[in-house]
Amino acid sequence: MIGIPAASILEKAETILLAGAGGGYDLYTGLPLYFALRAAGKTVHLANLSFATIYASTGKRIGPALVEINARTTANHAYFPELHLAKWLKDQNEPDTIYCIDRTGAAPTAAAYKYLCEHLNPDAILLVDGGTDSLMRGDDPCLAPHRKI
């Protein structure tokens, strides 16, 4: 069996923040994990670094560089992967809230994640990437200290 370090962390976690790391449609690559974690009884919150014009939507601005959307959110632009996903999730009878992080730089992104951690209190954060713009193992030495579960 392949030993994936994140697997043991996710097994112990009850609440997980699953986030697209590179933006755009990256969050979609995490959907198999989302459904597996939900089937295991976990609470899973979704977030994504967004390339959409999130402030031009009816989503709720809840923190620094952070907008909460759901299937009832409206937008005047067609490119909004998170909104399409929220509507699809609602059609699947799944929770449809997605947290969109504006791509404004490292400090606002870190502040958005801090806000999400303070308000959602996840036991684990899992970043997913659909390409190669993020190659990390999760225990990389340059990452901030993480909580052991």
Predicted region positions:
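Short beta-strand segments
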Residues: 19-20, 48, 127-131
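Short, charged beta->alpha transition segments
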Residues: 3-6, 76-89, 109-122
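Short, glycine-rich nucleotide/cofactor-binding loops
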Residues: 18-28, 141
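Internal, conserved structured core segments that host functional sites
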Residues: 101-149
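Glycine-rich nucleotide/cofactor/substrate-binding loop typically near the N-terminus or early
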Residues: 35-39, 44-101
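Short, highly selective alpha-helical patches that border small-molecule cofactor pockets
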Residues: 26-30, 34, 82, 86, ...
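Short acidic, glycine/serine/threonine-rich loops at helix termini
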Residues: 29-30, 56-61, 136-140
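Positively charged, low-complexity intrinsically disordered leader regions
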Residues: 1-17
